Amino acid sequence: PVIWTLHDCWAVTGGCTHFVYNKCENWKTGCYRCPRCGNSDTGGELKGVFRTMPWVLRKKEAYITSVPNLTFVTVSEWLSGVVRSSVVGSVPVQVISNGVDSTRFYPRTDIQAIKQKYGCGNRFMIVGVSSHWSVSKGLYDYYKLRELLPADQFVVVLVGITSEQKNNIPDGIIGVERTENLDELALIYSAADVVTSLSYQETFGLTIVEGFACGTPAVVYDNTALPELVDSDTGLVVETGNMERLAEAIRQVCKTGKSFYSQACREVAQTRYDKFCQYEKYVELYEQALVPKKV
């Protein structure tokens, strides 16, 4: 038996890990007329590679469908739907979410030091976290959001910013370079009043769940897998790219207060997304896969 966990869309496309930002659905029928060709912002410098995508996808389809006892695991219902709509949609799919270590990510009480370290003061702290900030991750949307909220009341903190990006971000946004220190990251989540994802394409949204584990509500865009994570007890979902609605949602969370959401956020992280729960689901799947099939 083969269990293949998908964290992005590469397996079902001619080579793209994501396609939503480029508004492409060609992967459903063969990856012809690739919109990435010639677009330097999304990899057009490799347009020769992208022109081979139809051939690559045909090869993937042949190889994947030839495996007799294959099961895909996807990290969200959204990604599961993508697989089922693809050229390898006949392969069985099971959803097992990414997991969070709730013994490392938990509400911290010593948050004033981290607020002072980054100069947040007592302002409402809006946090976004990414390992790679780009246009499709919503970087410029944070710039726009900053202009819609009074700087003396709200502060935007972006974690994972490169040193080059840090030198170029607008006034009123605090850039924090990537940290491998989970305790510091948990402190930032705990200090935040809201954790956000303004990404245009996510197969899961682990930073949101890490924020939940630290008792922090979320505001996310209504695309791909993000809406699966958030309900009215844990935050708000807004129309992708609608900056007025986004600012309104931030103000609503501010008015309601973080404490209204915190317990539900922590419970969701522990009961639905704890990593040990996900391990158990994998063990169960492996055991099922090893049961001899009846002829």
Language model: regions and residue ranges:
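Membrane-proximal helix-turn-helix segments that form the acceptor-binding/catalytic region
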Residues: 10, 26-72, 81, 85-87, ...
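Nucleotide-activated donor-binding/catalytic signature segment of Leloir-type glycosyltransferases, i.e.
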Residues: 160-186
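A charged, aromatic-enriched C-terminal amphipathic alpha-helix characteristic of glycosyltransferases
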Residues: 259-290
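Conserved acidic donor-binding segment of nucleotide-sugar-dependent glycosyltransferases
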Residues: 232, 236-243, 252-258
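Aromatic "clamp/platform" in nucleotide-sugar-dependent glycosyltransferases that forms part
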Residues: 200
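Conserved donor-binding/catalytic core segment of Leloir-type glycosyltransferases
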Residues: 73, 119-137, 143-146
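Short alpha-helical donor nucleotide-sugar binding micro-motif in glycosyltransferases
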Residues: 187-192
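Short hydrophobic beta-strand element within catalytic cores of glycosyltransferases
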Residues: 217-220
